[in-house]
Amino acid sequence: NDHPLTNFFKDDEKFIKFKNECTKTGTTEESIANAEKIGFKTNIKAVNPLDETKEVPVYFANFVLMDYGFGAVFGCPAHDQRDLDFAIKYKLEIIPVICPPGESENFKIDEEAYTGPGKIFNSKFLNDLKAPDESILKTIEIL
């Protein structure tokens, strides 16, 4: 199954090539985890639902499955390794939003995503909440 947005690109030669490349990869968790992360940048921008002043580019990617949720994800490259690998490859902005205990808010994400607990920052109304517990509850409340 393809995401409905693919219909807008069905005649785009670069998209067709991307889609054909994606079909070479299996759809099991293991095959997706081990596959090179590839993407197709659309001309679509999405508004960040937690910060309406920010727009983010919309990509099709080979590691997002239509059968999981809505077939779309809002990437968080600083805190998810697949998203980080993708962001590095496509030179996307990487903004940490969880500060590890004992670190300053100037810490950098390089090759490894930070997936541990900490304090939320760079997140406006979520700043200073504990991650993951308090921040998840507040985000659900807002959305």
Please annotate each region the language model reported.
Residues N1-I94, C99:
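NTP-handling and nucleic-acid-processing catalytic cores
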Residues A72-L143:
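Residue patterns forming the tRNA-binding/recognition surfaces of aminoacyl-tRNA synthetases
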